[in-house]
Amino acid sequence: MKILGIDPGTRNMGYAVLEKNVNKISLIEAGLIKMKPENLQFQLTQMCEAIDQIFEFHKIDEVAIESMFYAYNPQSVLKLAQFRGGLSLKILQVFGNFAEYTPLQIKKNVTGKAKADKTQVAFMVKKMLGISKDIKPLDVTDAIAIAITHAHNLRGVK
């Protein structure tokens, strides 16, 4: 089973494709989709094209994204909400459904601590997948953690 994890962002969007076989999870591909700092419509178009390419290249069985979180800057929250809405619609059009996890759920699942910092999440992601080198940037690590969380929630599924 192939799982796509997505860490939404308006400038950078991390993604990861994992393979889940019984009790083993393997990293197939992970990367960063960089959005040019243009207007929202241009960024949404870039994001949609990138999502199309991922779905065309991989036979995805499950999709999981990080849900919205609180931020202090209302403009940032508004822009991210618009972008997430576009991302959600694109996934629904191409795939049909997706799972959502809060940052606290993801951190707790991967590290055992809901208040873990990004370096702790990155450490555990590497350990769980048997990766020795650093995974950068952290948007990519977050996308992998999202996919791992979804894989763990599908325990009975092969």
Curated annotation (Swiss-Prot):
The RuvA-RuvB-RuvC complex processes Holliday junction (HJ) DNA during genetic recombination and DNA repair. Endonuclease that resolves HJ intermediates. Cleaves cruciform DNA by making single-stranded nicks across the HJ at symmetrical positions within the homologous arms, yielding a 5'-phosphate and a 3'-hydroxyl group; requires a central core of homology in the junction. The consensus cleavage sequence is 5'-(A/T)TT(C/G)-3'. Cleavage occurs on the 3'-side of the TT dinucleotide at the point of strand exchange. InterPro entries: RNaseH-like_sf, RNaseH_sf, X-over_junc_endoDNase_Mg_BS, X-over_junc_endoDNase_RuvC. It catalyses: Endonucleolytic cleavage at a junction such as a reciprocal single-stranded crossover between two homologous DNA duplexes (Holliday junction). Its cofactor is Mg(2+). PANTHER family: CROSSOVER JUNCTION ENDODEOXYRIBONUCLEASE RUVC (PTHR30194:SF3). It comes from Campylobacter hominis (strain ATCC BAA-381 / DSM 21671 / CCUG 45161 / LMG 19568 / NCTC 13146 / CH001A). Belongs to the RuvC family. This is Crossover junction endodeoxyribonuclease RuvC. The lineage of its organism: Bacteria, Pseudomonadati, Campylobacterota, Epsilonproteobacteria, Campylobacterales. Keywords: Cytoplasm, DNA damage, DNA recombination, DNA repair, DNA-binding, Endonuclease, Hydrolase, Magnesium, Metal-binding, Nuclease. Its main location: cytoplasm. Disulfide bonds: none annotated. One of its GO terms (cellular component) is Holliday junction resolvase complex. Binds 2 Mg(2+) ion per subunit.
